[in-house]
């Protein structure tokens, strides 16, 4: 994806506020061989770009001052309750340096799996994105996971999926975490109906006959 940014001369709270009022979003681009540079972007164009998955997970082409450079989206600050992007950060990409990036997982074939078609399992996508390490040229926009072979009560782990060439999974704690699980549907247990012709309890029989249940017989007094 490609977007246009403009050089920003002024910084500070007041300058940023005036930018937002004029329909612009303040930002910064850093990293690589260049110095950190203040930028500004058209807010409406940025707002629509942020709705696209690729803007968050792929290498972007930023046009700035007549030159184009490759960058990654690194941070977005939103207003707490208004539809407003308050600030945005981009990082320059070095073609020879491995990078860490979260890549979306795209699942397919779930409805054709035995777990769903035959056993009516409930399939849970435990993970929706994967943090990976790779060179910029090897960064995938997304990783596709085929669930058509999923069996009942099965779990799928990171090691069960094939990562693109040059891409490695970055672990934080668990070396092989679960990404998908299939479990049987919950079945509510209903009370079993009374057997036909079964005799009702003594008290219930008396109530059904219109009378009151017989009182318990008093015990005889103990002899002195």
Curated annotation (Swiss-Prot):
Coiled coil: none
One GO MF term attached to the UniProt entry: structural constituent of ribosome
Family matches, as SUPFAM superfamilies: Ribosomal protein L25-like
GO (cellular component) term, any one: cytosolic large ribosomal subunit
Source organism superkingdom: Bacteria
InterPro entries: Rbsml_bL25/Gln-tRNA_synth_N (IPR020056), Ribosomal_bL25/Gln-tRNA_synth (IPR011035), Ribosomal_bL25_b-dom (IPR020057), Ribosomal_bL25_C (IPR037121), Ribosomal_bL25_long (IPR001021), Ribosomal_L25_dom (IPR029751), Ribosomal_uL5_bac-type (IPR020930)
Key words of the record: Ribonucleoprotein, Ribosomal protein, RNA-binding, rRNA-binding
An annotated GO BP: translation
Region feature Disordered, mapped onto this chain: 190-224
Pfam annotation, one family: Ribosomal_TL5_C
Family of the protein in this entry: Belongs to the bacterial ribosomal protein bL25 family. CTC subfamily.
Function statement: This is one of the proteins that binds to the 5S RNA in the ribosome where it forms part of the central protuberance.
Alphabetical list of PANTHER family matching this protein: RIBOSOMAL PROTEIN L25/GLN-TRNA SYNTHETASE, ANTI-CODON-BINDING DOMAIN-CONTAINING PROTEIN, RIBOSOMAL PROTEIN L25_GLN-TRNA SYNTHETASE, ANTI-CODON-BINDING DOMAIN-CONTAINING PROTEIN
Subunit structure: Part of the 50S ribosomal subunit; part of the 5S rRNA/L5/L18/L25 subcomplex. Contacts the 5S rRNA. Binds to the 5S rRNA independently of L5 and L18.
Protein name from the UniProt record: Large ribosomal subunit protein bL25
High-level lineage: Bacteria, Pseudomonadati, Pseudomonadota, Betaproteobacteria, Burkholderiales
């Amino acid at each position: 994806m490609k977007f246009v940014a403009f050089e920003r001369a002024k910084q500070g709270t007041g300058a940023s506020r005036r930018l937002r009022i004029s329909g612009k979003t303040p930002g910064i681009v850093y990293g690589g061989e260049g110095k950190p540079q203040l930028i500004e972007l058209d807010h409406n164009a940025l707002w629509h770009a942020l709705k696209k998955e690729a803007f968050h997970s792929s290498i972007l082409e930023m046009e700035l001052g007549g030159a184009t450079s490759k960058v990654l989206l690194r941070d977005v600050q939103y207003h707490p309750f208004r539809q407003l992007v308050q600030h945005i950060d981009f990082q320059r990409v070095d073609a020879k340096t491995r990078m860490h990036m979260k890549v979306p997982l795209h699942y397919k074939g779930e409805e054709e799996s035995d777990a769903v078609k035959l056993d009516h399992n409930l399939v849970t996508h435990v993970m929706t994105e994967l943090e990976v390490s790779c060179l910029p040229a090897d960064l995938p926009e997304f990783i596709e996971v085929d669930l058509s072979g999923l069996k009942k009560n099965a779990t799928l782990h990171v090691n069960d999926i094939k990562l693109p060439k040059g891409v490695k999974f970055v672990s934080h704690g668990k070396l092989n975490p679960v990404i998908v699980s299939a479990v049987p549907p919950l079945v509510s247990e209903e009370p079993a109906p009374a057997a036909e012709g079964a005799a009702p309890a003594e008290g219930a029989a008396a109530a059904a006959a219109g009378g009151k249940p017989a009182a318990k017989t008093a015990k005889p007094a103990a002899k002195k």
